[in-house]
Amino acid sequence: MEKSKGLVTIPTDLDVVPQTLELMKLWGADAIRDCDGTDFPTELKDADAEIYSTYYTTRKDNAWAEANPEEIQQMYVMTPFYTAESETLEVEVMKGLYPDMLKPNTRDDIKRWWEVIDRTTGEVVPTDKWDYSEETGKVTLAAVPFHEYTVSFLAYIMWDPVHMYNAVTNDWKDVEHQITFDVRQPKTHEYTMKRLRKFIEDHPYVNVLRFTTFFHQFTLIFDELAREKYVDWYGYSASVSPYILEQFEKEVGYKFRAEYIIDQGYYNNQYRIPSKEYQDFQAFQRREVAKIVKEMVDITHECGKKAMMFLGDHWIGTEPFMEEFKTLGLDAVVGSVGNGSTLRLISDIDGVKYTEGRLLPYFFPDVFHEGGDPVKEARYNWVTARRAIL
């Protein structure tokens, strides 16, 4: 019986070239890709396969981010609830958060973009009743004894959450923290288009650009011990900046409040009924993200390459089942098959030439370790995916 070939993509790295070639033959793979933290081997550039290159639009360029700190991406974060025991309350805004990941934004007007709320009454504390000290990292406010208070603040994303997750999970030592820059802002937008063209020019052997992903990370926050503190795959709280919010205000005709994102600390998770303001913001984000994605996809096609999107990571604003997705012009979507429902989420996408499921487990030490059983996990993942296909 003749062995078939095609519709299988395999990952590679510099030190596994013979194994990559062996698996290509064994599995009939027709595509090879690099991964976060790996490099594509020169020996495989002429392999009989399509070559995918993972492309990061918002990170892996700290020189640019550090030279343009005002265009680093930001997110809204809320402190825990604190009970006032007297008429003065101090709130340490970064308490319980990983210090290397976030940095409070004091560059922009904090009295405009931050918000202190009396959660007992639901009232906003007037801006003349509180102050922030950069030296102590604390907000000091005039309080009503035994009322509960929170501070909602903007913070720069100084360590990309996905890069941090990969570094922590793989125990990467002495790795430079990749800063997340904001492609929506003018200087970075212009630079990004030039950077994309240069990347394609420098990698002529690449057939498919695997955008991972585009501009805004889903909500992913780590605690002070580098553990996942809050995760929402659909969260928009890391898609904000005064630049973006001022554009939004011009479109909708009303002032933006931090609470539209914070939502009493629920961050508008998928179990909440969204407010009109939050829905307005999501619609605005999808439209604005779609414009720049289309620009990047057009450049990719102009240079003779295919454009593939990873379903996840910085995917906010590119949700495949919304109207704007059809305007992006993507060739393909790839996603991680966590279970049957995520497989169907990927396979049912319209408006692309093909979809691709990345089967688990990751080649990470949480599975690939002494006593681990990656075969068991792989088999379970495959059986679950097959059930969804059938």
Please place each PLM-identified region on the residue numbering.
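Glycan-processing catalytic domains of CAZymes
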Residues: 1-390
